[in-house]
């Protein structure tokens, strides 16, 4: 999936399942549960032992869009794409990761927490901005940021659950990420 195609698909699906655990088997089982629950965009953080192997395994399924999280630099980005990752997520803004993603035509979503970081990431070529951690004020904060920065594609991945996801989306978020809150 090319970067632009992923952005378009994510704009339709609007939700991803994100797994962070210290057990590869548990990660696979939990992701299967998320998929049974309807998720089609799935993310394995690189902190999971065997994360690249999980990406390879889940990429074999044509009904899924599989990415990696905790991508900290260009090296992680290349290894992720070599394993089959179709999008890259980071907890912080690393311009080498964003550049590598652009060179490979893979969507990047660096972690941001302030409007300044969001603008920096977007200007560096990021396709979306992961909002991490969720700020006090939640959806109202997002609405405030999107007033002067309406083109920023904000995706909160912390503090989102089945009870408030619609509030985040109504505030203008491009999508939301569920970090093991549902499964």
Descriptions of predicted regions:
Residues 1, 16, 25, 113-119, ...:
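Alpha/beta catalytic cores of nucleotide-metabolism and tRNA/nucleoside-modifying enzymes
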Residues 46, 70, 91-93, 112-114, ...:
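Short secondary-structure boundary segments
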Residues 87-97, 130-139, 171-183:
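Glycine-rich phosphate-binding active-site loops on the catalytic face of alpha/beta enzymes
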Residues 39-44, 81-83, 102-104, 114, ...:
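Glycine/Thr-rich beta-alpha phosphate-binding loop at enzyme active sites
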Residues 73-119:
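Helix-adjacent hinge/juxtasegments
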Residues 1-86, 103, 151-154, 162-163:
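Conserved N-terminal beta1-alpha1 strand-loop-helix module at the mouth
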Residues 30, 73-83, 116-124, 141, ...:
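Catalytic cores of alpha/beta
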């Amino acid at each position: 999936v090319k970067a632009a195609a992923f952005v378009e698909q994510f704009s339709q699906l609007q939700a991803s399942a994100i797994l962070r655990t210290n057990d590869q088997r548990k990660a696979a089982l939990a992701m299967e549960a998320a998929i049974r629950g309807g998720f089609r965009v799935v993310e394995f953080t690189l902190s999971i032992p065997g994360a690249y192997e999980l990406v390879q395994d889940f990429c074999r399924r044509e009904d899924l869009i599989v990415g990696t999280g905790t991508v900290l630099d260009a090296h992680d980005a290349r290894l992720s794409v070599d394993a089959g990752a179709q999008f890259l997520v980071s907890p912080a803004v690393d311009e080498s990761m964003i550049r590598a993603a652009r060179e490979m035509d893979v969507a990047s979503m660096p972690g941001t927490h302030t409007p300044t970081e969001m603008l920096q990431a977007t200007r560096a070529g990021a396709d979306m901005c992961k909002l991490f951690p969720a700020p006090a004020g939640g959806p109202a904060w997002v609405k405030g940021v999107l007033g002067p920065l309406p083109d920023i594609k904000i995706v909160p991945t912390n503090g989102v659950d089945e009870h408030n996801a619609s509030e985040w989306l109504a505030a203008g978020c491009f999508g939301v990420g569920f970090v093991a809150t549902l499964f």
